Amino acid sequence: MKKKIGGIGLCMLAWSILTCAQTITPQAEQRAKDIVSKMTLQEKIEYISGYTSFSLRAIPRLGIPEIKLADGPQGIRNHAPKSTLYPSGILSASTWNRELLYKLGQGLGQDAKARGVNILLGPGVNIYRAPLCGRNFEYFGEDPYLTGETAKQYILGVQSEGVIATIKHFAANNQEWSRHHASSDIDERTLQEIYFPAFRKAVQEANVGAVMNSYNLLNGVHATEHKWLNIDVLRNLWGFKGILMSDWTSVYSAVGAANAGLDLEMPKGRFMNLENLLPAIKAGTVTEETINLKVQHILQTLIAYGMLDKEQKDSNIAEDNPFSRQTALELAREGVVLLKNEGNLLPLKGKTAVMGPNANLIPTGGGSGFVTPFSTVSVAQGLKELKKKNLLLLTDDVIYEDIVHEFYTDANRQMKGFKAEYFKNKTLSGQPEVIRTESSVDYDWGYGAPLDGFPTDGFSVRWTACYMPQTDGQLKLHIGGDDGYRLFVNDKHITGDWGNHSYSSREVELPVEGGKEYRFRIEFFDNISSAIIRFNAYSLNEAKLRQGLAKVDNVVFCTGFNSNTEGEGFDRPFALLRYQELFIKKIASMHPNVVVVLNAGGGVDFTNWYDAAKAILMAWYPGQEGGQAIAEILTGKISPSGKLPISIERKWEDNPVYGSYYENLKAEIKRVDYSEGVFVGYRGYDRSGKEPFYPFGYGLSYTTFAYSNMAAEKTGEH
């Protein structure tokens, strides 16, 4: 890794009354015990769960203020509508730069203080076991040492600002699929060598203030109920004295969690509450001393950070912090990885076309890692600034035309729009309560009802329409919703996400024939909470595309995943969306010099389109300043220097964990056998002899090295 920071010197810069890394002193422990002794049993039980979704309750009579928590690893997403969007964790790890990672922590800490946030819910350090995990983008790769060093500097930076960092998710939360029900079955050697080291380093070398348990089970026991994990290892073996909290709704038993070392249930006391714990204490299945220790752990951590003695909000720090913006830019510059540069196509020369679904936006992963920034610089914007008149925009808004206004309610083509049928049930069953014509399918009903007299939850809607193109062509169809949605064309299921979930979306391309009728059917249901449904249809103007490509010397195609296709709560496919792969090859058939800028939180399947691209830039999720950094790399203003923190397989079947990632799908507790043991990532490829498509640590630059006029001089007998 690059320049190492002198820990002592940096801690001298921190808030003067804090010790380096905010060690919990005997004085802090005693003060916490004194406060606990003054609390009623009811106050103590109420204090070990969230007051709101992202705060702990205040107890004014004891001098305890309200404590604010906030997601997440890539930026502060609570307690203010906008914040700095830093690059994803996997990009940060690709910098291999301790000094810059410390600055990332400082920026996050400053952003937290600007909003009065006490506890940051990051970093995430779960090991990259397979490319399918939806939260890989938040984490730091496949190597325990790199992950541990990255997390250490991140934590030291955050906590130098007087903000508590939270390392998560303890432990072995290496997939999002069935995360509440899947058991990670792992032998102890593998835990100690692969999955524990980053947590251990965070506790013992960075003095992290908080640890978050994971959703999953470990060897058949939920993490929040795992005494060996939380007490024997974390507390007794590693010496952790801080706060052990649950992930949000990852507690499944009051007594089990209370006796297994969990201090804090979030977001609310669904299990560890008065209703459950008072009878348990009376029955002797939980002791009051156990409750006391939980409250003490929370309070002594807050005391160590001065949070009972000072206002956390620092009004001298701007919410849109210049230091944070600059740090986000520096990370993006150093973490983007150049994977391919055939014929030295890069840096770009001559006139460039920029295009693709991600050219006009800065994509990021979804879930608690999603942040709304004050501003962003897209790749198109970044290139426009640097290439000026030598840039042609062929972005989706230029080459695709909205055709929803050409839809008719039926084949008679008398009335434009969609026939909408509304049902007061989730199953589209029976007769619709309301039938009407609507000009589009674009609704965000929030927590309200779709129509007067309808329930706010548990309803469904069907829209039907007909479309007849004038000529052969290609449509791009986008559909998204919260909860279930699905799209049919001529009674064939095209795409969808038919289940209970937060907002997600799907995008497909559909070839069409001129003069042929296409019948569209969109179905939607709302389960509970918010209700959203959106549908858009676009037609590719291929003539405009060909005319544009004929005018340029090279093409930058920005593609990959985004917050709707990669994120918390679901796993993603290894391959890009099929239409994206096909479009890369389509562009390559029209122009010889294609550069692919790829957004993803981990490895992808390159095999279907690798030969179509002369250059490939792994941009990960580069944060709000990512477009500027990518443009600087593409134009040669800076040389790419990122190195992969993962191995990328040729095909999913080559991965060492293939065959043991999804198992026993129908069981209530799904057992995932980590049968590869310690041979995850590059260790597995070393053992199997299979060659990855790109090895761990790979990354090109524009620099060339050469030796000339070499000579050896004999200086002695040997």
Go through each PLM region and give its residues:
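Glycoside hydrolase catalytic-domain context in secreted enzymes
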Residues: 20-475, 480-493, 498-718
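Bacterial Sec-dependent N-terminal signal peptides
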Residues: 1-26
